[in-house]
Structures are given as C-alpha cells and as structure tokens.
C-alpha cells in the first residue's frame, strides 16, 4: 500500500506548482509594461510576516506550530503543545505604518481549530483631486483588515495537514475591495525517518482577483456625442490578482538546542526568495535567533517611452526587497516566573534603504 503521507505531500506540491503556472509568474504585460509585477497585486498586506518567532520566515513553513502557524503553514496548528493558545503581535512597519495580529487556537484530539485577525494601520493621507493636486485640506485613513479561520489535523504521529480561509478587505474613503483567499499546507516531522529533520510545504493566498467598488468611483461627466447634461458615470476599475506564493522548507536539529532551517519561496509578483534561520534554545529560559533573507535573482526595470509620458528608456532601476539581509530576535519563556505557559518573542528586521525605519516585532503568547 502506497504511503498516504507521501501522497499528501505530493498532492499539495503539485497543486501549488500548477496554481502558480496557471496565474503566470513574472512578467505583467510583456515588454510594453516595462518590467516585473512588483507592487501590482491587491491585498499586499497578506505578504507581511506575522509574529516575531520566525523573523523573515526561514524554515517557518516546516517548524511553525500552534496558533502562530495560521500565517506560515496551517498544518502546524495541529502540532500545538497546548489545548488552548492565544497570541497577540505588534509590528512597526516602514513609513510609520504598523501591523497588529491576534489569534486563538483550540486543540480537540487530532483536530485543531483557529481564528486569526490582522490589521494594517497606514495612518492619515492628504486628500488630493484633479482640481486640487496640492490637497483639499482633508485627510483620510485607508482600512486594511484580514480575518481567517483555520482547520488542521494530525494525519499520523508525524504528518499534519491544514487549511485556512481568509477574507481580506481594503478600503479608502468611499471605495472598497474584498477578496477571499485560501492557504493549504502539510508538515512532516522526522522526514524519511531522519531524526530532527522536519519538512513543510504550503501554498498561500490562492484566490480570485479583487475588484474595487463604491460610490467613490462615480464621477461627473458629459457623454460624448449626446445632448445629455452632466451626469454621474461610474469608472470601471480593473481586477487585481492576489499575491499567491508557494513555499517549501526544512529544518534540522544539528545538536540539542541548535536548529538550522531554510525556506524557498516562489512568489507570483516578486522575485523568488531564500530565507535562512538559525536558533539556539536554552530549555525553559530563552531562544536566540538570527535570520537572512535574499533574492535568487536580480531584476532591472527599464521605463519604456511607449508606456510613459517621459522618455526614460535609457535609465534602469534595480528592484530590491526592502528587507534583504540579516535579522535578529529571540524568545523569553515566562513559565518559571509566572507559573503559566507564556512567552514573549522579539524580532529586529533592518531595512536596506536609508529613510525607512527598521521593523521591530513584539509577540505575546499564552497557552493553557
């Protein structure tokens, strides 16, 4: 009889690769569009890492467990060490933005159920119009909110699978867009019977494009070729794909307390990435971590005179990830001090560009 666990891993892998191929990966509109798809998706907040324990994500797809796995790989939720877990995280983002993440998970036998929410606070933005390009004096605050439901199950003593359904809402003034996305993954502990070798595979943000609606898309205009007076007409916006990605990672316990891990990410809208992390744990006391994020290819964008009013065809701009490079963090375990299964995670993630604030992430975890 064929091993069901191998079938599960293969099925998720095949589904992920097929989905990426169907949506198309790298170019958006070919040469006329002038470059890659960076920044052209909807629901970009889905790409912001949640929680501090996994830094930029090195090996998280293989090692994330409990409620924190709701973002990285829903399969890990079934591997929680507590029957009830809660988490709350705050991340300082660049340009004075911030991200809040909260979640809870309950374990019932081999099954786990979880709920999570995340919100991106952009702050206030001045209102500008065609007739007031310098601003009207008003300000608005965009809204960006995601809620998710997760189901995870232990398929065997070493294999778990999970699915998350997310609903993301983006809005500004009188315009709003909503998208439903799905995450699915599998984790395997002691892969191929190698003690300490964990493997994980996940596809995230699979869903239909987001379309924006609302009265803010109405504008006053006169229909050409008619005798009609000025009337309201609706601007039909284009659909924007969600930023689907595929991750495959592994982690290995080199020695008691020392783990090294890595993840390969194939992203539908950005360059592919490699994420690495090393962690050393003193049981019951603390864990220290160091991570690294790097892109597998260099992309240069050339502006095309056929798609811009300014001829900049001779200038090339290299597209880099804001968080390329090293990151650091750790966890302090509070059980011996508080008597409850609680911990605090911290991550420091520098940006690679001057003028952008580095990110600091704090996470409080409590288990019962």
Show where each model-derived region lies.
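Bacterial N-terminal signal peptides
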Residues: 10-18
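A short, polar/charged loop/turn motif at coil->beta-strand junctions and beta-hairpin connectors
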Residues: 51, 80-83
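Short strand-turn segments of transmembrane beta-barrel domains in outer membranes
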Residues: 59-61, 84-93, 349
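Acidic, small-polar-rich N-terminal luminal/periplasmic segments of exported/outer-membrane proteins
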Residues: 50, 57-60, 74
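N-terminal periplasmic accessory domains that precede
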Residues: 68-79
